[in-house]
Amino acid sequence: MNHSETLFEQAQKYIPGGVNSPVRAFRGVGGTPVFFKHAEGAYLYDEDDRRYIDFIGSWGPMILGHSDPRIKAALHAQVDLGVGYGAPTAIETEMAKKVCELVPSIELVRMVNSGTEATMSAIRLARGYTGRDKIVKFEGCYHGHVDSLLVKAGSGALTLGVPNSPGIPASLAEHTLTLTYNDIDEVRETFRQMGDQIAAIIVEPVAGNMNCIPPVPGFLEALREVCDEHGTVLIFDEVMTGFRVSLGGAQGFYGVKPDLTALGKVIGGGLPVGAFGGKREIMEHISPLGPVYQAGTLSGNPLAMTAGLTTLNAISEPGFHDRLTEKTNRVKDGFKAAADEAGIPLAVQSAGAMFGFFFTAEPSITRFDQVMACDVERFKAFFQGMLKEGVYLAPSAFEAGFTTAALSDEDIEFTLAAARKVMKTL
């Protein structure tokens, strides 16, 4: 029994399922989850001192790589000053200013502690601003474990086969309308029938919780159009895409501005941070300026702001995202070439520095039903094979992969050599 197996056995005695987030339990791929004790650059090291090239990056935040010296130095300096005050700090304003400068649609921003808090608060704000109750979301998109949004969700809910969680009152869920991602006609018809009742559309501009599905041409533009026509708030959930697809997020990449944006992951530099922001007219409805209540004990804490601001400054360097996207494309295209060489049907997709691959004969994946028809068993075998070779991919066929600035040419070549080897065994 290796150290991970022993630790997992112990963890299950005190933690539900042995993990603090379901996808980590390896239910989607089988076997025992790997327990890590150290990370540096592009690498993770498990409790048996085995090294893995990391394509998860803590599920997205570690865009610079692990243990970046700039982040470490900044955090050490802040720890000496104090880890939290529960009062305003100068760095909160610096962080907010930076976010407003980088994200095209954000005029005011409120810091929170997670992506779930960000989407939850954005939904409450949209309802308070419009005086309406109904929300439109899309099948397979995940917006955190918020009651009203955990309906036909992606991410860990999809991995475990429970996209509709028990514990959500029917009276609450009935206000959530779930449509088909990338189906423009369905959106238009829904708004034709009940547009004056809909407070908001919330959407992942690149769906990253049913693997990686970019928007089809015209989809985001159509959402913007129907929201403008019906006085509905358009919310982009950029928890995953923010600062990763491009410096300005998916909205900067695709040129479509939402009314509100939810942020997380990269914005915290590895610490727990979320944010939501948008048009001044809407954001001024948040307390203490307006009647929509939102608060948090640790919101804007100086440690998280320090890590986040240091990260945003680093990724603002010229050429950063171009280099990261080039690395992502090499990995994505290399996986496809390895599959073709082995005679394995595989579709690959990406947006900036996030990517996905699907074991399917279809040339591209644009909808949830296509995702569900992919060969999950073959994915499991590929995941386990790559893990044995020292490459750590997301332990679910329904999660996107991420590249980091620390990933070297040698790391990419090692990964693709492993992919060629494993593909031949499938």
Swiss-Prot record:
Entry keyword Metal-binding: no
Residues recorded as bearing N6-(pyridoxal phosphate)lysine in the entry: 265
Entries under PANTHER family matching the protein: GLUTAMATE-1-SEMIALDEHYDE 2,1-AMINOMUTASE, GLUTAMATE-1-SEMIALDEHYDE 2,1-AMINOMUTASE 1, CHLOROPLASTIC-RELATED
Protein name per UniProt: Glutamate-1-semialdehyde 2,1-aminomutase
One GO CC annotation: cytoplasm
Pfam family, one: Aminotran_3
UniProt xrefs under InterPro entries: 4pyrrol_synth_GluAld_NH2Trfase, Aminotrans_3, Aminotrans_3_PPA_site, PyrdxlP-dep_Trfase, PyrdxlP-dep_Trfase_major, PyrdxlP-dep_Trfase_small
SUPFAM superfamilies (alphabetical): PLP-dependent transferases (SSF53383)
Metabolic or biological pathway, per its Swiss-Prot or TrEMBL entry: Porphyrin-containing compound metabolism; protoporphyrin-IX biosynthesis; 5-aminolevulinate from L-glutamyl-tRNA(Glu): step 2/2
Domain of life: Bacteria
Catalytic activity, as annotated: (S)-4-amino-5-oxopentanoate = 5-aminolevulinate
First-level EC class: isomerase
Protein's cellular compartments: Cytoplasm
Cofactor(s) of this protein: pyridoxal 5'-phosphate
Subunit comment: Homodimer.
Gene Ontology MF terms in the entry: glutamate-1-semialdehyde 2,1-aminomutase activity; pyridoxal phosphate binding; transaminase activity
GO biological process per UniProt: protoporphyrinogen IX biosynthetic process
EC number: 5.4.3.8
Family of the protein in this entry: Belongs to the class-III pyridoxal-phosphate-dependent aminotransferase family. HemL subfamily.
Keyword line: Cytoplasm, Isomerase, Porphyrin biosynthesis, Pyridoxal phosphate
